[in-house]
Every structure is written in C-alpha cells, then in structure tokens.
Amino acid sequence: MNQMNPAFVMPDVQSTVDTRQIPIQRVGVKAVRHPLTVCTESGDVQPTVGVWNLDVRLPADQKGTHMSRFVALLEENRAPLTVERFRAMLASMLVKLEAEAGRIEVTFPYFVNKTAPVSGVQSLLDYEVTLAGESRNGDTRLFLKVLVPVTSLCPCSKKISQYGAHNQRSHVTIDAELAADLPVEALIRIAEEEASCELWGLLKRPDEKFVTERAYENPKFVEDLVRDVAQRLDADERVVAYVLEAENFESIHNHSAYALIERDKRQAA
C-alpha cells in the first residue's frame, strides 16, 4: 500500500509563472448544476436547481486559476439567495481566487403560484431567471434577467377580419442592470401587464373565455409590446439599464416576429 511521505510537498502548478505573458479575460467553470434556494417577494424560500458559470480574470504571468475553489464557493453558500448575498458571494470569489475581476451567473427555473382570473383555481407557472454579477476595478454591477411567456394578438388581423384574430404565445425577456434590490415578481408583472394577456398553468372554461376575450380587447404588435414594457422600465428607478426583447411565435407563419430595445439611463442623464 502506497503511503505519502509526510515531508513531501505537493506542487502548486497553477501558481507557477507563465512565460507567454498573455492575460486571460475569463477563466473558470461553466454549467455547474447545484441545488439552490431563493427568497421570494413574499419572504418565502423556494428550492430550485441553478446552473452556474463562475470565472475570473487571469494575469499574464500566472499559469492557471484554481478551479476547485469555484465549486468550493458554491458549497459554502447554501443560504437562500438574495441580491445582497449574491453581491457578497462575488466579492468572496475574488478573494478566494486572488483575482482583480470576475463574474458569476446562475440560471434557474422560478415558480409563481397564480390564481385563474374567473374560477380562482391555483396553479404554478415557471419562468427562466438569470442573476449575474461582475466586478472589475472595484466596480460591481448586478443584472437580473427574466424570460416571461405571454399571449399576443395581432392588431392587423383583428382589424381586417370579420371575426377572430390570430394570436400566439410570446416571450418577453428583460435583462435589467440593477441600482437596488428588485424582486423577480416585479419584472414578471411588468411583462405580463403589458402583454395582450398573461398565461396560467391551469384554466377552466370560464377562464379560457376570459383569456380569449382579454387578448382580443388588447391587441399588440411586437413593436407595441417592447415599447410598452420599455416605458415601465424607464419609470422604475431600480433599473439603471436594460436589454429588452420580445419574440412572437407567429401562429400563421413558420417564423417569429422579433423586437429589441436597449437603453442605459446613465447615458441619457
């Protein structure tokens, strides 16, 4: 049986000098699946699974980073995730990896319990959420991204048809840079309230009637959808910049309709 010599010192290859003198902007681990709990707007804790990307900047004279420390960081941070804890986690990563710059990103399914508009039956609806943070030269920026499924109904189709109008499921994606803590539910509400109609996981027949008529009374082009959501984001002081996308999965075409608005309020000030 092999026994390690107690006097033997295991070499740290990653910390040796690299003679090529080429810095690496981002190096780390990608697509790490790890259990995660997140705090909801109501103060409850929701269990989910996060897919993590963690990386740091590597100086030109350092051969490699310490990959195991990224995973160790996840193991050490099991408390329910909030924006402030995420910020602290980013700072801790830079200390652990002895790095001047770094980025953390986690994507996870987030569930909201919704009540049907007429019958009142409750059901869960899932949303894709990404929380990201980057730190460079002492400056930390935090981003919250939410993909919200909604319904859109075509104003042109309604106008030219004797009855009915084509409608479809759409995705509104809001990627917001945060100035202050902003609940996931707040971004979801903005997207759903500005769509032709929101979605529910479970609907009874009276609910289906409501959804159909609500969308018909509130038609919107993809251009209308992004502009209306953009107005809401412009008015929210918790958001300093955003990239906003809308994609309509057209029911009468084999392609999507798409629109994007990008704005940094700091440049407009």
Curated annotation (Swiss-Prot):
Pathway: Cofactor biosynthesis; 7,8-dihydroneopterin triphosphate biosynthesis; 7,8-dihydroneopterin triphosphate from GTP: step 1/1. It catalyses: GTP + H2O = 7,8-dihydroneopterin 3'-triphosphate + formate + H(+). The record marks C154 as: May be catalytically important. Its EC number is 3.5.4.16. InterPro entries: GTP_cyclohydrolase_FolE2 (IPR022838), GTP_cyclohydrolase_FolE2/MptA (IPR003801). One of its GO terms (molecular function) is GTP cyclohydrolase I activity. Pfam families: GCHY-1. It is an enzyme of class 3 (hydrolase). Keywords: Hydrolase. GO terms for biological process: tetrahydrofolate biosynthetic process. Converts GTP to 7,8-dihydroneopterin triphosphate. Belongs to the GTP cyclohydrolase IV family. This is GTP cyclohydrolase FolE2 1. It comes from Burkholderia cenocepacia (strain HI2424).
